[in-house]
Amino acid sequence: MIPGELITDGPDHLLNEGRRTVTLVVQNTADRPIQVGSHYHFAETNAALGFDRDAARGMRLNIASGTAVRFEPGQQRTVELVDFAGERKIYGFRGLIQGAL
């Protein structure tokens, strides 16, 4: 067993099943890599990432918890975002929301 590894006896687990998702094209206009973690409010990411921030409001990357996506300088890639769940209150990050969505 690898530290942190999960071994299940059932079928594959579907992440975020039934939640609203959005697919966006993201361009890194910076001269260095930018990495975004799984639960970062995507609309508040580094300003050098070019994408539709209004469409990303209240959403995060639709990837496994604890993982991240890296955008190399000049790279363009398509990402899938998923709605935040729970109370849908956003605090911290770049301080743009600081409360309910």
From Swiss-Prot:
Pathway where it operates: Nitrogen metabolism; urea degradation; CO(2) and NH(3) from urea (urease route): step 1/1
Family matches, as Pfam families: Urease_beta
Disulfide links within the chain: none
CDD domains given in the database record: Urease_beta
Gene Ontology cellular component list: urease complex
Main location: cytoplasm
Gene3D superfamilies for the chain: Urease, beta subunit (2.10.150.10)
UniProt subcellular location: Cytoplasm
Swiss-Prot/TrEMBL catalytic activity: urea + 2 H2O + H(+) = hydrogencarbonate + 2 NH4(+)
GO annotation terms (biological process): urea catabolic process
GO molecular function: urease activity
EC number(s) reported in the record: 3.5.1.5
Keyword annotations of the record: Cytoplasm, Hydrolase
Assembly behavior: Heterotrimer of UreA (gamma), UreB (beta) and UreC (alpha) subunits. Three heterotrimers associate to form the active enzyme.
Protein family membership: Belongs to the urease beta subunit family.
Name this polypeptide is given: Urease subunit beta
Source organism of this protein record: Polaromonas naphthalenivorans (strain CJ2)
Lineage: Bacteria, Pseudomonadati, Pseudomonadota, Betaproteobacteria, Burkholderiales
